[in-house]
């Protein structure tokens, strides 16, 4: 008898991740159910437009919805919109652990649009420190802070970057 292996995708883009995601929420959730998954995350780029549809679809299928977002983090300040560096950013996946985390995630994403928008909705370290409660952060993708630093060959800086989010 083989033991059931549990697996949850924690970094998932839907059709709301423009130019990056193509999965339609309903189909995605149904497929997760077919594969025997009991939970699934949504982490669209810089937006939470699909969260309500995702939540409802997951509940209908008996899957635990994990609400998240892959945010863009400005290297310095979200208000910096004049320097060459201000167009750069790194990715960070944020997952709501509880209701407080969900509310903080909504604040972060909203402020990314209202205060930090420069080509993309950006947050910064100040906002992440202020609204971190109830949120789990992962290093995202190759555009994440740890991966970018490792790719550049800076192990010690990457380690410091990872430890910053503990």
In which residue ranges do the predicted regions lie?
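Phosphodiester-processing cores and adjacent nucleic acid-binding clamps
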Residues: 1-166
């Amino acid at each position: 008898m083989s033991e059931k292996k549990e697996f949850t995708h924690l970094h998932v883009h839907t059709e709301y991740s423009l130019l990056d995601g193509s999965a339609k929420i309903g189909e995605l959730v149904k497929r997760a159910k077919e594969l025997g998954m009991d939970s699934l995350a949504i982490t669209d780029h810089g937006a939470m437009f699909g969260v309500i549809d995702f939540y409802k679809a997951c509940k209908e299928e008996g899957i635990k919805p994990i609400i998240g977002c892959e945010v863009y983090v400005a290297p310095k300040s979200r208000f910096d919109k004049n320097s060459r560096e201000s167009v750069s950013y790194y990715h960070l996946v944020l997952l709501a652990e509880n209701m407080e985390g969900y509310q903080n995630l909504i604040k972060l994403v909203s402020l990314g649009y209202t205060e930090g928008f420069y080509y993309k909705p950006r947050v910064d370290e100040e906002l992440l420190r202020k609204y971190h409660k109830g949120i789990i952060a992962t290093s995202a993708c190759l555009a994440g802070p740890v991966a970018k630093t490792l790719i550049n060959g800076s192990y010690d800086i990457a380690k410091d970057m990872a430890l910053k989010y503990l």
